[in-house]
UniProtKB/Swiss-Prot annotation:
InterPro entries: Aa-tRNA-synt_II, aa-tRNA-synth_II, aa-tRNA-synth_II/BPL/LPL, Asn-tRNA-ligase, Asp/Asn-tRNA-synth_IIb, NA-bd_OB-fold, NA-bd_OB_tRNA
Taxonomy, superkingdom: Bacteria
Protein name: Asparagine--tRNA ligase
Gene: asnS
Pfam family, one: tRNA_anti-codon
């Protein structure tokens, strides 16, 4: 064992009682007793709990330094690991030396002083908020989920591919994209028609931040069979809500020779795998969320893992909603895009389990989704989860070139702009499927937090790009 074990390694019993170690971290709290002892709670971010360090007043720097320590000071505490008589943790550290590495300049104005802060306030000091119990726990859970996703796809034989963040294609055909340009805004070049001349821009054409890695991912799926992307995506959607971010991460698998049924099975297997991982690997953080954020968060994940997914056609789901007798805020009729209240009714009240809604009307779905034989619906699916609604959206992709071209024209897109995507249908086309999972929405579901801005380190939203 290293001379500098983590707090996690010490508290989990990987360091033997009686061993001399040095703990490097930050002071959470300091408490002094009349018996001439100080109790320092030192954390290093490796786990939820700090380690208690007992410091005797015979240390050389006890009066000059130890008694001045406040929340946030960085220290190296050397001492012996001993069994703790106190409740809460099995071991503690009996200090023989305390080195102060960094002081908090003015404890009275330190934004992370040892008191409870509102979540709204923490957003204003996002550069310091990972020091709190809440955001520290979110960060560890986020890491655990990301690692579990990579592990799952690797075990399933998928290859990770890096798709570009700068693109000339709009995957969703929605037009809500951030433009990338180096043109001088005060002296824009113009065409003869008076439009901005993007041929003089850095890439020689209009370019944007990507809204999805899907189209690029499909090119590799049609060569490597099974691939996935996992990276940042961007939407210039002017939505200042608890569910939207302008910059967020997406998990997007694509696999060849796969039907919509295969797609639904992959989504179910992946979600259950990562939920199981976080419950096993981050028990301390999940217990914190269950105690302070949402008391049902652990049982919700356990129930999700245990429940087989229900499946229902969109048309049947509309019938269920119409016959429910409930008065929804958004009226129900065939052809609407299901709103959050519809999704949650289906998952929470009707099926009481995760549910895959499939075969949506073509007019409310993207051009690349496979047209069904009825000519009215496409082989699309949404996975709805109790407690949040839609958590995954996907489809079988349209592999027939003539049908794809027709769909593009119907959606007002120029097939020539997607010449490279169309090539996949010209040269050895194959049925293939995939889905998208908003990573931050997954973390919101796992932690029970109400606002997506708490689960990404530096949230980007309308009129908010600080730090």
């Amino acid at each position: 064992m290293s001379k500098f074990p983590t707090v996690s390694e010490i508290l989990s019993g990987k360091v033997a009682v009686g061993e001399e170690v040095a703990v490097r971290g930050w002071v959470r709290t300091r408490r002094d007793s009349k018996a001439g002892l100080s109790f320092l709670a030192v954390y290093d971010g490796s786990c939820f709990d700090p380690i208690q360090s007992i410091i005797n007043n015979d240390l050389a720097n006890y009066n000059d330094e130890v008694l001045r320590l406040t929340a946030g000071c960085s220290v190296i505490v050397t001492g012996k690991v001993v069994e703790s008589p106190a409740e809460g943790q099995a071991v503690e550290l009996h200090a023989t030396h305390v080195e102060v590495v960094g002081w908090v300049e003015d404890p009275d104005t330190y934004p992370m002083a040892a008191k409870r802060h509102s979540i709204e306030y923490l957003r204003e000091v996002a550069h310091l908020r990972p020091r709190t119990n809440l955001i520290g726990a979110v960060a560890r859970v986020r890491h655990c989920l990301a690692q579990a996703i990579h592990r799952f796809f690797n075990e399933q034989g998928f290859y990770w591919v890096a798709t570009p963040l700068i693109t000339a294609s709009d995957t969703e055909g929605a037009g809500e994209m951030f433009r990338v340009s180096t043109l001088d805004l005060e002296n824009l070049p113009r065409t003869e028609e008076g439009k901005v001349d993007f041929s003089q821009d850095f890439f020689g054409k209009e370019s944007f931040l990507t809204v999805s890695g899907q189209l690029n991912g499909e090119t590799y799926a049609c060569a490597l069979s099974k691939v996935y992307t996992f990276g940042p995506t961007f939407r210039a959607e002017n939505s200042n809500t608890t569910r939207h971010l302008a910059e967020f991460w997406m998990v997007e698998p694509e696999f060849a020779f796969a039907t919509l049924a295969d797609n639904a099975k992959l989504a179910e297997d992946m979600l259950k795998y990562v939920f199981k991982a976080v419950l096993e690997e981050r028990k301390d953080d999940m217990q914190f969320f269950a105690k302070h954020i949402d008391k049902d968060v652990i049982t919700r994940l356990e129930n999700f893992i245990a429940a087989p997914f229900a499946q229902v056609d969109y048309t049947d789901a509309i019938e269920i909603l119409l016959k429910s007798g409930k008065e929804f805020e958004f009226p129900v009729s065939w052809g609407i895009d299901l709103s959050s209240e519809h999704e949650r009714f289906l998952a929470e009240e009707y099926f009481k389990s995760p549910v895959v809604v499939k075969n949506y009307p073509k007019d409310i779905k993207a051009f690349y989704m496979r047209l069904n034989d009825d000519g009215k619906t496409v082989a699309a699916m949404d996975v709805l989860a109790p407690g949040i609604g839609e958590i995954i959206g996907g489809s079988q992709r349209e592999e027939r070139l003539d049908v794809l071209d027709t769909r593009m024209v119907e959606m007002g897109l120029n097939p020539e702009d997607y010449w490279w995507y169309r090539d996949l249908r010209k040269y050895g086309t194959v049925p293939h499927s995939g889905f998208g999972l908003g990573f931050e929405r997954l973390i919101v579901y796992v932690t029970g937090l109400q606002n997506i801005r708490e689960v990404i380190p530096f949230p980007r939203a309308p009129r908010n790009a600080n730090f």
